[in-house]
Design a protein with these regions (language model features):
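Phosphate-binding site of ATP-dependent enzymes
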Residues: 144-241
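A long amphipathic alpha-helix within ATP-dependent nucleotide-binding catalytic cores
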Residues: 207-260, 283-301
Length: 302
């Protein structure tokens, strides 16, 4: 029987996954990314590794995990171990700059953006953009470190307090005015849309994580909806081009044009809490079915 390992860091996000695997009778090894060691002379690897490493790990004191995972994925793929959300996908998870480049390569509209690695250069990078702007750590998640600046003068006054994150790079984007005050999140698994959520922020903050474990921090309201057809097509193309097996892709409908504008890609995508009530089914069951099919195919190869 093919062996499965799940590589992860957050202590709570993946309980539903492990419970669903157990219900399905699929055994797995749990690899904790913040306490990781692996032998370069190792010859017996799992047949399938499911990468569930998050870009927000550094904000929980686990920045060392992000760099070790990058090396582990390179080793696994070099040994021809099958990886769900492998090295190419992970590079997108930990770089918002690369996400913007992927959107552009895919022909998906994205906000005008720039990047910088110091407060002084951040101010310089913004001079070609139209305010207001959003400044985000390049490697981050769950809204950590995200700030809005309404003028260049405000940014100049507060640039020294901007969070650059674990790689010391910040992304700055023109703010996109939303047509309905909402953003939309398309969940994709194995080249197909699982569901789409309309996300309404309730109050301040930018933590739009939909999972149970984020409920105390995220004040967003999630409802199921149908994505714009052009947004769905673009999101699927982005996932294919980025070699991403599972992800959540977010867009806003620009009130000036009515067009979808893509601004975030979550390779580590948490399913919505209370999924049966919100989307009508348990996405973990479909995820485990997918993993089961991958394992079955690998068992036949063995």
């Amino acid at each position: 029987v093919a062996r499965l390992a799940v590589l992860y860091e957050h202590p709570q996000w993946f309980r539903p996954l492990f419970e669903a695997l157990e219900r399905s009778g699929i055994a797995c090894e749990e690899w904790r990314a913040e306490e990781l060691a692996f032998g370069l002379e190792e010859t017996e690897w799992p047949d399938l590794v499911f990468n569930r490493m998050s870009a927000s790990a550094a904000w929980r004191g686990h920045g060392r995990a992000q760099f070790a995972v990058r090396e582990l994925l390179a080793v696994l793929e070099g040994r021809r171990v099958a990886v769900v959300n492998g090295a190419a996908a992970y590079e997108l998870e930990i770089s918002k700059v690369r996400q913007m480049e992927l959107f552009r390569r895919a022909g998906a509209r994205a906000p005008r953006s720039a990047a910088a690695n110091s407060p002084r250069q951040l101010v310089r990078a913004c001079q070609g953009l139209t305010f207001p702007v959003m400044v985000k750590p390049n490697c981050g998640g769950a809204g950590a470190g995200v700030r809005r600046f309404d003028s260049l003068a405000q940014l100049e006054a507060e640039a020294e307090r901007v969070e650059f994150g674990c790689d010391h790079v910040a992304l700055v984007q023109e703010h996109i005015p939303s047509r309905d005050g909402a953003c939309y999140r398309i969940e994709i698994l194995d080249g197909q849309v699982l569901y789409c959520l309309k996300v309404q922020r309730d109050g301040g903050g930018y933590n739009l994580c939909p999972a149970d474990a984020c409920a105390a921090e995220s004040r967003a309201v999630f409802t199921r909806c149908e994505p714009l057809p052009e947004a769905e097509a673009a999101a699927l193309h982005v996932a294919r081009l980025g070699r991403i097996d599972l992800c959540g892709i977010e867009y806003i409908v620009d009130h000036r044009t009515g067009e979808p504008v893509f601004y975030d890609l979550n390779v580590l995508s948490n399913f919505v809490a209370n999924a049966r009530e919100v989307v009508g089914f348990d996405p973990y069951e479909r995820l485990v079915d997918y993993l089961g099919r991958r394992l079955h195919a690998l068992t036949r190869i063995r």
